[in-house]
């Protein structure tokens, strides 16, 4: 949830209803109101409803529920003479801009709105940063987004003298908080007029030159970041809310210097989401019609049409919470009112049962214990230096370097355990079952979760045969007659390792640990290890059922 503080009288004046009615309607929008004092209220808003983070956004939604305005809001949009030239900025490559004229806003609320967007879609300015300037104080019609050296000087916000960017990083609170996000190789991103004067260094601080005050009605807005989609969404959210405050949106021509591409900003992109009548009925348990569904969609301030029997919802870009059909159904439920949805008397006669993978993992653990192994449990996170494959998920901001990667095998964890228990009574037989994250180019992220089991023996004298026998027993007990094919890798001794196959499908690896690997982990005794791919085993066993 995101919390905002608003003047209740200003908000109520925009929608002309009483406070209790306001609270009831906000509850329908999954928001809660708490009084602070005579004049102010605190509103908790769902973190995905970024369009509701200002009084104007809230007023827009409530006008729909009151049926004072239906469908997507229509705003005055005009072309301007302003141009933003986007140069090659390596740390934050994307930028868009817009102008808003004659918006009647509360300055304190606008700053709150900006910071709430920074904290949500902006990921504390790492993903998106917003600069809002007094348009009267912008001298140039051509603005450039580019890299500048840290020796560049300007007067930062609320300061009265010029500072270099280096000094801003050292002396100002904003510089200390956000300087590490975008500064690299001795340069900083900057929004600069064509005369060279700096308007801002995103995501750190604006220039004092374009500082907002209570008389500001015309705005120049820049949005920069690491994701073009997030930059476009953020700008659309801001300008649409300012337009609700009576503003006229001015388009800015955006030129990409690298490839000479050109676009008009803000983009005002829309997407079409088809909604099935039967799906709405099933999810909400109500009797309805296509026309009734469209009416509720319009009350939620989106356009809706019925074409050839298909309900087509037009989703504005500032509704970042609408990802698929179920999100539209949720909006319909909010329009109806959750209190108006009657619970159905449904008694389930089904009983819960364990997932097949859970049962298989339990069986493998029981077989491991029966074979004389002691179960251990390691963390899923591991130090990247202990991994054998360079294809792994790296933690971006680890709390400690000891846990800066996600394991892609259980073997490093077992070896680490053996290295710390060489004083224990021999032989040491241990095993572990658990999740790993492995490279998979066919997935949208490039990685997938995999379930595995690994077994290890350490003794004064131990060989391949010592580990093969119990592994063969475990697999045979599962109903798999496997074969072993000699296959070398960097973990095991050449000629003393194999891959485990079942009907030409690889089920795991097994072998004597290479002395170089033992030295790397500080192990002074020989060890043998096997790792089974439970996910692959499950597929085979499922096919046999």
Swiss-Prot record:
Q: Which GO terms describe its cellular component?
A: phenylalanine-tRNA ligase complex
Q: In the record, what terms sit under GO molecular function? A: ATP binding; magnesium ion binding; phenylalanine-tRNA ligase activity; RNA binding
| E.C. numbers | 6.1.1.20
Q: Where is the signal peptide?
A: none
The cross-references to InterPro entries, in alphabetical order and at most eight, read: aa-tRNA-synth_II/BPL/LPL (IPR045864), B3/B4_tRNA-bd (IPR005146), DNA-bd_dom_put_sf (IPR009061), Phe-tRNA-ligase_IIc_bsu (IPR045060), Phe-tRNA-synth_IIc_bsu_arc_euk (IPR004531), Phe-tRNA_synthase-like_B3/B4 (IPR020825), Phe_tRNA_ligase_beta2_arc (IPR022918), PheRS_beta_core (IPR041616)
Record key words, sorted: Aminoacyl-tRNA synthetase, ATP-binding, Cytoplasm, Ligase, Magnesium, Metal-binding, Nucleotide-binding, Protein biosynthesis
Could you tell me the superkingdom of the organism this chain comes from?
A: Archaea
Q: Which reaction does it catalyse?
A: tRNA(Phe) + L-phenylalanine + ATP = L-phenylalanyl-tRNA(Phe) + AMP + diphosphate + H(+)
Query: Which residues are in the B5 domain?
Result: 268-343
Query: Where is the protein localized?
Result: Cytoplasm
Gene Ontology biological process terms in this record: phenylalanyl-tRNA aminoacylation
Enumerate the residues binding Mg(2+): 321, 327, 330-331
Q: Which cofactors are reported in the record for this sequence? A: Mg(2+)
PROSITE patterns documented for this protein:
B5
> Matching CDD domains, A to Z?
PheRS_beta_core
Family in the record: Belongs to the phenylalanyl-tRNA synthetase beta subunit family. Type 2 subfamily.
Name this polypeptide is given: Phenylalanine--tRNA ligase beta subunit
In its UniProt entry, the species of origin is given as Saccharolobus islandicus (strain M.16.27) (Sulfolobus islandicus)
């Amino acid at each position: 949830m995101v919390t905002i503080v608003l003047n209740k009288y200003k908000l109520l004046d925009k929608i002309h209803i009483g406070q209790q009615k306001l609270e009831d309607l906000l509850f329908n929008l999954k928001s809660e109101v708490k009084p602070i004092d005579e004049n102010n209220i605190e509103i908790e808003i769902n973190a995905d409803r970024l369009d509701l983070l200002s009084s104007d956004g809230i007023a827009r939604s409530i006008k729909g529920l009151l049926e004072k305005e239906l469908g997507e809001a229509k705003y005055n949009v005009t072309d301007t003479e302003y141009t933003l030239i986007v140069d090659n900025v390596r740390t934050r490559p994307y930028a868009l801009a817009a102008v808003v004229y004659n918006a009647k806003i509360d300055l304190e609320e606008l700053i709150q709105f900006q910071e709430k967007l920074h904290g949500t879609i902006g990921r504390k300015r790492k993903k998106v940063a917003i600069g809002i300037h007094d348009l009267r104080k912008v001298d140039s019609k051509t603005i450039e987004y580019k890299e500048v050296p840290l020796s560049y000087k300007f007067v930062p916000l609320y300061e009265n003298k010029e500072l270099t960017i280096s000094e801003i990083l050292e002396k100002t609170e904003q510089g200390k908080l956000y300087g590490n996000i975008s500064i690299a190789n001795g340069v900083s991103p900057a929004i600069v007029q064509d005369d060279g004067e700096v308007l801002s260094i995103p995501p750190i601080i604006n220039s004092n030159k374009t500082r907002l005050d209570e008389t500001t009605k015309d705005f120049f807005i820049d949005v920069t970041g690491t994701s073009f989609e997030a930059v476009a969404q953020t700008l659309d959210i801001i300008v649409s809310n300012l337009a609700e405050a009576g503003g006229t949106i001015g388009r800015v021509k955006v030129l990409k210097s690298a490839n000479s591409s050109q676009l008009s900003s803000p983009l005002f992109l829309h997407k079409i989401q088809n909604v099935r009548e039967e799906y709405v009925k099933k999810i909400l348990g109500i009797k309805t019609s296509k026309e009734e569904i469209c009416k509720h969609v319009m009350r939620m301030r989106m356009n809706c049409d019925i074409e050839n029997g298909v309900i087509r919802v037009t989703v504005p870009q500032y509704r970042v919470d609408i990802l698929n059909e179920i999100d539209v159904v949720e909006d319909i439920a909010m329009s109806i009112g959750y209190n108006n949805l009657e619970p159905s008397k449904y008694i389930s006669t089904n009983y819960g049962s364990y997932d097949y993978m859970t049962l298989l993992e339990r069986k493998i653990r029981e077989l491991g214990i029966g074979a004389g192994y002691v179960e251990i449990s390691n963390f899923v996170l591991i130090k990247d230096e202990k991994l054998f494959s360079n294809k792994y998920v790296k933690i971006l901001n680890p709390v400690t370097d000891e846990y800066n990667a996600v394991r892609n095998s259980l073997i490093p964890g077992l070896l680490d355990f053996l290295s710390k228990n060489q004083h224990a009574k021999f032989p040491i037989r241990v095993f572990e079952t658990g999740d790993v994250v492995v490279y998979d180019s066919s997935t949208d992220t490039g990685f997938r979760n995999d379930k595995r089991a690994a077994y290890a023996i350490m003794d004064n004298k131990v060989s391949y045969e010592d580990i093969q026998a119990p592994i063969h027993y475990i697999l045979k007990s599962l109903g798999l007659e496997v074969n072993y094919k000699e296959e070398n890798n960097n973990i095991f001794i050449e000629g003393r390792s194999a891959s485990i196959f079942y009907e030409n499908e690889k089920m795991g690896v097994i072998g004597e640990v290479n002395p170089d690997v033992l030295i790397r982990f500080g192990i002074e005794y020989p060890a043998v290890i096997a790792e089974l791919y439970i996910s692959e085993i499950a597929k085979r066993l499922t096919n046999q059922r």
